[in-house]
Amino acid sequence: IGVIFIGGDSGYIGGYKEFGEKFNVKYAVLPTGGYETRWFAAYEHMNIEDSLNAAADLKCRVMIPVHWGAFHLGVEPPDYTGFRFNSIVKNNENMADIIKLINLGEVFYL
């Protein structure tokens, strides 16, 4: 059936790999937004590269980035994370099945 992993407010940690080895993670909801400047935000939010690494470590089938687009928390514009993930999906067809970017107010059925 699979596990839904919710990262909450967390930066990238090595424990994701261990979790991915022990559990069948189907969905990973990862905090990806409000991540600049790194010296301040790295402990609580992942940047895009960190979240992609966490998704790989967790061996999830679907990654859902959260904490982006609603509030201006970091130096990056609020919609920048969505723009970057859309670019990644556009340039890497295999990522379209893995990254599910959910817009504010949008419904995503598991």
Task: Indicate residue ranges for each PLM-predicted region.
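Beta-strand-turn-beta hairpins that frame and shape the catalytic cleft
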Residues: 1-4, 110
